[in-house]
């Protein structure tokens, strides 16, 4: 069975405007799966779509939705009702701002939980039944090393990523014997535009174009993801992340 037969004909990628999300979408298209590109900024999504179409034969569709807003999952479901979605990858999720929990309004934490917990859960509940019925499909939920243990200045973020990991593990337990691959992909520091901006604001790097110390390359992360789609329920990306987990065990 080809990749496209198992996971196609369409994939939905949430958070695919740049970084690991855009790279994952490109990887899907290279494997002949059509991709719905989803994020807040339509203009950027259109650029990603154009790049994909110029390099692969897959079709694309762009969908601009703010995942922090209530009703986001319903809007996504309505906008993709004419498509057969065989693969869902959820890599949206804001980086922490490294402020104490009490220094931010509660609305900031609520938006984080909406984006990182509620929407992926709702999308899985919507799209997974058709995958189960066909006996094939895939779901990848991006997690973070911040979800492995609580830490200051990442209270809502780390907690939401802990949810993502446990949710993926539990969903794998229910779906893997039904032909649906579920993977919680746990990332460490990754050289994305969002991380570079964050580290630049914190004074950790001198320019937003600098590579943060110890950050994994996006292409390496995506290569590991595709190589381990069937190795759920979780996969720790990068040797440094796996070593850190071993030390915590």
Label for each model-derived stretch:
Residues 10, 15-19:
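Conserved glycine-rich cofactor-binding loop
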Residues 14, 85-93, 116, 141:
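Rossmann-fold scaffold of SDR-type NAD(P)-dependent oxidoreductases
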Residues 31-47:
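Conserved glycine-rich Rossmann-like NAD(P)H-binding loop of the short-chain dehydrogenase/reductase
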Residues 69, 74, 78, 87, ...:
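Conserved mid-core segment of classical short-chain dehydrogenase/reductases
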Residues 102-122, 136, 164:
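Catalytic Tyr-X3-Lys loop
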Residues 124, 160:
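Active-site helix of classical SDR
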Residues 144:
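Residue(s) in the substrate-gating loop at a strand-loop-helix junction
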Residues 184, 200-248:
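C-terminal helical subdomain
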């Amino acid at each position: 069975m080809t990749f496209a037969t198992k996971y196609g004909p369409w994939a939905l990628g949430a958070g695919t405007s740049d970084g690991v999300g855009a790279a994952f979408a490109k990887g899907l298209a290279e494997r002949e799966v059509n991709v719905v590109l989803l994020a807040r900024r339509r203009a950027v999504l259109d650029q990603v779509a154009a790049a994909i179409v110029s390099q692969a034969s897959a079709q694309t569709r762009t969908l601009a939705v703010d995942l922090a807003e209530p009703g986001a999952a319903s809007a996504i479901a309505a906008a993709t009702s004419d498509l057969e979605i065989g693969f869902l990858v959820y890599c949206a999720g804001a980086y922490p701002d490294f402020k104490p929990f009490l220094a931010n309004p509660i609305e900031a934490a609520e938006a984080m939980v909406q984006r990182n917990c509620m929407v992926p859960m709702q999308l899985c509940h919507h799209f997974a039944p058709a995958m189960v019925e066909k006996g094939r499909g895939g779901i990848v939920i991006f997690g973070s090393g911040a979800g492995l243990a609580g830490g200051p200045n990442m209270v809502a973020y780390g907690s939401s990523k802990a949810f993502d990991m446990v949710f993926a593990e539990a969903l794998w337990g229910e779906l893997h014997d039904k032909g649906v691959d579920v993977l919680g992909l746990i990332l460490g520091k990754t050289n994305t535009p969002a991380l570079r901006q964050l580290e630049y604001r914190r004074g950790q790097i001198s320019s937003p174009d600098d590579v943060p110390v110890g950050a994994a390359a996006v292409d390496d992360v995506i290569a590991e993801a595709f190589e381990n789609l069937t190795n759920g329920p979780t996969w720790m990306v990068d040797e440094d992340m796996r070593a850190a987990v071993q030390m915590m065990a």
